């Protein structure tokens, strides 16, 4: 079964917002269900501009509790009370995420008419499970506890071989559908036919990874390996490795090195330093593309469709 999967860049900036560059936030839409990664200032604005239905947000994944990644969260929580919402909202993040949510609710005297479930994490683990996918967190190295995330789908069934089914005397119709659903059937001759007899090898699902803020770590490549879409901070240009390491951030070339080593399909740089104009960001893009050609620049309201690997 084909399921649509799209990524929306709601904010691509780091540290401070700019008129054309909201703070970091990325949203994934999978068959109508929404998952938000960070909620920087301006997240609501991009949601509205893209006509995304915020009440469909099932979970929010927070990388860390620096202001440029969470200041958009209180507004989202209040906004969700303005629409009919019956499902709980999950918020996953490092230590102090729950404190931030509870303090915001108390100080702002929020009216919340739905359940909020906060889970704090400090070590790699699966933090959210769907019917056929999961979200996993892993540790980064920043100035305070920080997590990266991957959303990974289960493998899909292989391609159905109608000729094999015919050779096994399985009549076309409902029985073919059952085989494709993983259910054994009886042939016209009364013989049990198993799905593996008519289905090709399993096909991989899709994987999306989100990494910011962190200094360069070789271990990140293993976590994001084979991602179909990799969103990674590229805060500084080549030559600023020392400054980046001191501030526990990465350069665009370091991000590209991870993408290359992890064999991802496409990487989008994000969390740019406000020192760079849009024109100057093109220089960072070229530097990254010399290491990993399949690199693009994030920009606010960018939508990236994520196709299956066939």
Swiss-Prot record:
Gene3D superfamilies: Ribonuclease Z/Hydroxyacylglutathione hydrolase-like
The organism's place on the tree of life at top rank: Bacteria
An annotated Gene Ontology molecular function: 3'-tRNA processing endoribonuclease activity
Names of the cofactor(s): Zn(2+)
Catalytic reactions of this protein: Endonucleolytic cleavage of RNA, removing extra 3' nucleotides from tRNA precursor, generating 3' termini of tRNAs. A 3'-hydroxy group is left at the tRNA terminus and a 5'-phosphoryl group is left at the trailer molecule
Binding site for Zn(2+) 2: 68-69, 213, 271
EC number assigned by the record: 3.1.26.11
Keyword Transcription regulation applies: no
Residue sites binding Zn(2+) 1 per the record: 64, 66, 142, 213
Record: active site: 68
Alphabetical list of Pfam families matching this protein: Lactamase_B, Lactamase_B_2
Binding note for cofactor: Binds 2 Zn(2+) ions.
PANTHER family to which the protein is assigned, alphabetical: ZINC PHOSPHODIESTERASE ELAC PROTEIN 1 (PTHR46018:SF2)
Protein function: Zinc phosphodiesterase, which displays some tRNA 3'-processing endonuclease activity. Probably involved in tRNA maturation, by removing a 3'-trailer from precursor tRNA.
HAMAP family: RNase_Z_BN
Family: Belongs to the RNase Z family.
This protein's name: Ribonuclease Z
């Amino acid at each position: 079964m084909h399921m649509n999967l799209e990524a929306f860049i709601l904010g691509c900036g780091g540290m401070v917002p700019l008129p054309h560059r909201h703070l970091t936030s990325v949203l994934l839409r999978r068959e109508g269900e929404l998952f938000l990664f960070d909620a920087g200032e301006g997240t609501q604005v991009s949601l509205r501009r893209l006509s995304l239905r915020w009440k469909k947000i099932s979970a929010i994944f927070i990388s860390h509790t620096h202001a440029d990644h969470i200041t958009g969260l209180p507004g989202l929580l209040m906004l969700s009370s303005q629409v009919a919402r019956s499902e709980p909202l999950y918020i996953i993040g490092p230590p102090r995420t729950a404190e931030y949510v509870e303090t915001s609710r108390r100080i702002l005297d929020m009216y919340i008419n739905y359940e909020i479930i906060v889970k704090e994490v400090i070590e790699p683990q699966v933090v959210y499970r769907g019917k056929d996918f999961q979200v996993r967190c892993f540790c980064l190295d920043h100035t305070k506890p920080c997590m990266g995330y991957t959303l990974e789908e289960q493998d899909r069934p292989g391609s159905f071989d109608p000729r094999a089914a015919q050779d096994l005397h399985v009549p076309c119709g409902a029985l073919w559908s059952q085989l494709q659903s993983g259910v054994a059937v009886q042939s016209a001759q009364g013989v049990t036919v198993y799905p593996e007899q008519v289905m090709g090898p399993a096909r991989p699902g899709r994987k999306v990874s989100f990494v910011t803020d962190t200094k360069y770590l070789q271990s990140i490549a293993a976590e994001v390996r084979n991602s179909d879409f990799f969103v990674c901070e590229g805060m500084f240009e080549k030559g600023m490795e020392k400054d980046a390491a001191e501030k526990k951030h990465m350069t665009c070339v370091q991000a590209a090195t991870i993408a290359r080593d992890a064999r991802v399909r496409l990487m989008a740089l994000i969390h740019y330093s406000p020192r760079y104009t849009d024109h100057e960001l093109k220089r960072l893009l070229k530097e990254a593309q010399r290491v990993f050609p399949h690199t693009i620049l994030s920009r606010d309201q960018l939508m990236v469709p994520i196709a299956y690997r066939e």
